[in-house]
Amino acid sequence: MEHRVVECTFERHAASILDIFNDAILTSTALYDYKPRSTENMVAWFQAKAEGGFPVIGIESEAGVLMAFGSYGSFRAWPAYKYSVEHSVYVHKAYRGKGLGRVVLEQLIAAAQKNDLHTIIGAIDATNTASIALHERLGFMHVGTLPQVGFKFGNWLDLVFYQLLLSTPRDPVDG
């Protein structure tokens, strides 16, 4: 499948990202959310990514259709976590199983290294075996499970954490 990696923008990609988010909210446990998001949510989401200097990486088809995207953001708000980020990857339902999630995640890892981060963390629903397998193939280690922290579709949901340690930054500093 021919595709290209792109830096997503609000103007070009917000509607497609919103569709992918809302499908995940309404049909899966990939997002522990109940209500579909709005365009206003996307304005705030893109603004937060821009203010934090966080990438929003997409995969487009030759025709310009957004097939997958991913991003990362702060793992926790306190300053000592400045070298740690939490990422997410979403693939449009029509394009799953084609390796696009891997392409996005590899791009996020490269961006984290370029930005001198030290660890990238994924919080994954424990039943999402495809995402877990992808993370394990790329060297992420299972570092913990939080049992029954979510409730959706009439079921308690377990959340697993996968972490990849990077060799960057070379000279970390306090403060």
Q: Where do the PLM segments sit?
A:
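Conserved GNAT-fold acetyl-CoA-binding loop/helix
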Residues: 18, 22-45
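Conserved acetyl-CoA-binding loop-helix of GNAT-fold acetyltransferases
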Residues: 91, 97-110, 129, 133-137
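Conserved catalytic-core motifs of GNAT/GCN5-like acyltransferases
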Residues: 74, 79, 121-124, 136, ...
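Acetyl-CoA-dependent GNAT
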Residues: 35-94, 105-106, 165-166
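Acidic/histidine-enriched, glycine/proline-rich intrinsically disordered or flexible terminal extensions
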Residues: 168-175
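A short beta-loop-alpha structural element at the N-terminal edge
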Residues: 3-17
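Conserved GNAT acetyl-CoA-binding A-motif
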Residues: 112-124
